[in-house]
Amino acid sequence: MEALMFLTEKRDGTIKGRMVYNGKPTREWLSREDSSSPTASTESIMLTSVIDAFEGRDDMTNDVPNAFIQAHLPKPGDGQARVIMKITGVLVDMLVKLAPEVYGPYVVMENGRKVLYVQVLRAIYGMLQASLLWYKVFRKDLEEIGFEFNPYDPCVANKETYGSQHTVRFHVDDLMSSHKRPKVNDNFHRWLNKKYGSYGEVKATRGKVHDYLGMTFDFSEEGKVKVDMCDYMASMVDDFSIKLGPDDIEKTPAADDLFKEGDDVLLDKRRAEEFHTVVAKGL
């Protein structure tokens, strides 16, 4: 499979680059069972948050950086094939510049282009099975320190600590942890960094307001939690290339022509992709 490089501009104007594995062709032979990772259900996120508010728990959210590469691929053999990634063009130059002694001797020329073939040893972004491999690692590590997983949701785990329940729910590498004692979250944060912080600090958000999975959870009022997606919706509008004004408002999209195809000109590829992205974010 080939490597791809994506450059995106963040909201603060900085440019973020990520080299990923082009896993799209692997859909032909990877089954859903071998590539799909479970994620916490919306019902679980909401119900556990209500419990947090009712019990007056301390909440903490975390993001594990570079989570996927901390999961090893299965070793070749026993039905497992080696995974080879093809790197071409400017990406080869970048790698050679970073570590000439490592990559330089293995660069070859194909059709006038520099090519580098590497064996993939760990899960990387773009692999269909990357999130599942990370899930197995994280679940195993949580179970080793005494967490028991909810039989109805494989991404919610609980542990009895100081006589009270410690709850962790997660969506891939985004976590929310809660316990009545802030000290428990302090210790859990230290454990996360000790376990996964070698590729970047596992940062924590503490306090009464948390931005988690595109939602804002506000525990400021005792015994209650308020959930909204105002910031998420605002970012959708800001990122949309067509700028909307105060008069661009409809009471409902369910007009008489909602399901009529019409004969308008189709969107070009760029705008079609943008349209699909915005619709997907709104679902």
Task: Describe each PLM feature range.
Residues M1-L283:
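Long, low-complexity, charge-biased intrinsically disordered regions
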